[in-house]
Amino acid sequence: MKKKLVVLGLLAVVLVLVIVGLCLWLPSASKEPDNHVYTRAAMAADAKQCLEIGRDTLRDGGSAVDAAIAALLCVGLMNAHSMGIGVGLFLTIYNSTTGKAEVINAREVAPRLAFASMFNSSEQSQKGGLSVAVPGEIRGYELAHQRHGRLPWARLFQPSIQLARQGFPVGKGLAAVLENKRTVIEQQPVLWYVFCRDRKVLREGERLTLPRLADTYEMLAIEGAQAFYNGSLMAQIVKDIQAAGGIVTAEDLNNYRAELIEHPLNISLGDAVLYMPSARLSGPVLALILNILKGYNFSRESVETPEQKGLTYHRIVEAFRFAYAKRTLLGDPKFVDVTEVVRNMTSEFFAAQLRSQISDHTTHPISYYKPEFYTPDDGGTAHLSVVAEDGSAVSATSTINLYFGSKVCSPVSGILFNNEWTTSALPAFTNEFGAPPSPANFIQPGKQPLLSMCLTIMVGQDGQVRMVVGAAGGTQITTDTALAIIYNLWFGYDVKRAVEEPRLHNKLLPNVTTVERNIDQAVTAALETRHHHTQIASTFIAVVQAIVRTAGGWAAALDSRKGGEPAGY
């Protein structure tokens, strides 16, 4: 009897320990790891709720493309100042099954009635209906889903429909832009109605509901992309743009098609290959920067001492300057022959020639780098990186251009439209440095403007993704993407440090190197000793998101400059 009681007692103790263990383990198992390393799949973007939507899409059996679309639909709500369905995007997609990369071009195009001298002032290209180009976002989602989707199209819209109806707290990024652009918003009745309460713009944490966009999303979920381009939404879209002075027609929407690019730009970095879009984006600029710099064989030792670090950053800035000088020759390859320009910008021989012109002791006047024209800045963007369980990946960047785009927001559909023509060159306007506008970037019907996007996927010789990276932040996108790659690949920084490390930017025109406030003073001093003009950035330079393959899984990092955390499982 005693023996029986002892055994029962021991069993009771074991049972209690098991229950306690489960109580301690289960909550922590449901949490995301503190170091943001995920064993199966990962996502990085600048809106946490949207990442959770993407992650849940993956868990439900969705592909990397499914997750990207579901998350981007959400980002279009939570960061409406940067992107949405009235804009356009590019996607770089890597299929782990086939081992092939591709690019989908769903950027806006000029309406058929557009012409080079259509703007009487630069302000006209920034605000109002005339600044609106034909949106491509939804056609891009459609093509990507047709090629790589697993879940039903309508399923991808459901979480965002619910979010738009129920509302969500205004995030850090949107709140900052609302405050900064308060005067502009006050002048636009529809924006005022959407983003203000009690005569004040919404602040961080206050609830924003978007019922009209919820209805629009529902229509797209049911009818597909056709609803936007020649279905039940089309007539209202045309009416809204034309009522604001625009020239987009039903024919423009009917004829819009996203473009599949089956052979994206690629360059070798050691035993890996980088895939990215070519011109009309800035993939060739990124390629030239990295090709120039890889000849220096950078390593962690390159930034160990103040002297080494100063020289290394000087070389990086000089590579930026040479690359941006050549950027002025890029344009839409359907309208401008950029074959030779892109061939040079991706040539290791050409990069070596430019490297030989870099002096370790001084920078040079602008003319030394031989810029021929200038290209305008681009603005508000959103980037997203995804790696799915099967190892497939998506790097996607969408942009409305300047914050809140054209400021034209439909009172019926809730769609906020782009102002994509601020990134086109205007023939009548020479910039403040005396450089003429680039003819390669003049407006023509059906043409797309040059942008700084560099949505990149790095793949090893084994066919496995090593890194997915991209950025948001206008012209600085290219240099910030380059720095994130340099920091991780050559300096050996982990992905979080690669994304957070202070950055600098130089686009040649103006002749200034912008540095973040917390950058190492040894870097600034070394640059000034070498005759660089430096200035402290008034705000963060750009925002980077990245995912890197590690021994422990997928390490994801979200730039704290804009707030949020990555997601995965």
From Swiss-Prot:
Matching InterPro entries: GGT_CS, GGT_lsub_C, GGT_peptidase, GGT_ssub, Ntn_hydrolases_N
Signal peptide: 1-30
Subcellular location as annotated: Cytoplasm, Perinuclear region; Endoplasmic reticulum
Keywords linked to the UniProt accession: Cytoplasm, Endoplasmic reticulum, Glycoprotein, Signal
Binding site for L-glutamate: 107, 399, 420, 451-452
Active-site annotation: 381 (nucleophile)
Phenotype upon changing residue 193 to E: No effect on the absence of autocatalytic cleavage and catalytic activity
Family label: Belongs to the gamma-glutamyltransferase family.
Name of the protein: Inactive glutathione hydrolase 2
